[in-house]
Amino acid sequence: MYVGYVLDKDSPVYPGPARPSSLGLGPPTYAPPGPAPAPPQYPDFAGYTHVEPAPAPPPTWAAPFPAPKDDWAAAYGPGPTASAASPAPLAFGPPPDFSPVPAPPGPGPGILAQSLGAPGAPSSPGAPRRTPYEWMRRSVAAAGGGGSGKTRTKDKYRVVYTDHQRLELEKEFHYSRYITIRRKSELAANLGLTERQVKIWFQNRRAKERKVNKKKQQQQQPLPPTQLPLPLDGTPTPSGPPLGSLCPTNAGLLGTPSPVPVKEEFLP
C-alpha cells in the first residue's frame, strides 16, 4: 500500500498515470498520509526523496535511587542571608542533636591491684585453679630446699658442694688433673653427684690453678731497672766515671810545664 502511494507520488521518476502491470498490485487504495518526507539533502538528485523513519521514543526507566532529601536543612535550619551575615569568625561545633557515646569504663586501681594480688585466681568460678606462674613456683621450691644442694643465680643453677665432696674431689685432683671416664663415674656414684657436675668441677679447678701459677710467676720476676731522676735544671746526670780519672796524665802535663833549654851565644 505504501509502495503504491510512493510510486503514484513520484511521477518524475515513473512517468505515466498508470502503474506497471508487472507489480501485480490490486486497485489502488488510499490511506491517510504518513509523515512528511524530509527535504532532499542533495539538490542535484531531487527525484530521490530520503524518507527517515520517525525516531522511537527512549524507554523510560524507573529511578534506581530516590530523590535526595534535604534533611540537613531541617536539622541545621536555613543559612543566614547575605545581609544578616556577620563578619565574626565561624564557630564549628557539633549539631544540636549530637550526643557523644560514653566510653566504657577502664579498669580502676582497685581492679588492677586485685588482678596483681591474685595472679592464680581463675577467670570464672567453674574454671579449674591453674596458676600461670608454675615455673616460678618450681624454681622457688628448688631454691628454698636446703637439702637439695643447689642455689639459683640469675640464669642457671649453681651446685653447692659439701665439705666431704670437696675433700674427695681435691684428693682426686691431687693425683690426676684430668679425670678418666671410669673414675668420673665412680666419683659421681660415691659422692651423690652427676658426671657432668664432676667434670665441671675439674674444669674450674684447673682454671683456678692456672690463675694461681700465673700470679706466682709475675711476683717472682725481677723488677725492670728504673732510670735515675733528672735534676731540677734539666741537665742529665752523667752515669759514668769523671773524665779526669780516665786521663790522669793530662792533669800532670798541664799543671807542671817541662823546662825549655836556652842556648846562650857570646860575641868575641
From Swiss-Prot:
Spans annotated as Interaction with DNA: 157-178
Primary location recorded for the protein, binned into one broad class: nucleus
DNA-binding region, residue range(s): 154-213
GO biological process: anterior/posterior pattern specification; bone morphogenesis; pattern specification process; positive regulation of transcription by RNA polymerase II; regulation of somitogenesis
Pfam families: Caudal_act, Homeodomain
Region (Disordered), start-end ranges: 1-152, 209-268
Gene Ontology MF terms in the entry: DNA-binding transcription activator activity, RNA polymerase II-specific; DNA-binding transcription factor activity; methyl-CpG binding; RNA polymerase II cis-regulatory region sequence-specific DNA binding; transcription cis-regulatory region binding
Low complexity biased stretches: 73-91, 115-128, 229-246
Region Interaction with 5-mCpG DNA, annotated ranges: 196-207
Protein name according to UniProt: Homeobox protein CDX-1
Taxonomy of the source species: Eukaryota, Metazoa, Chordata, Craniata, Vertebrata
Gene: Cdx1
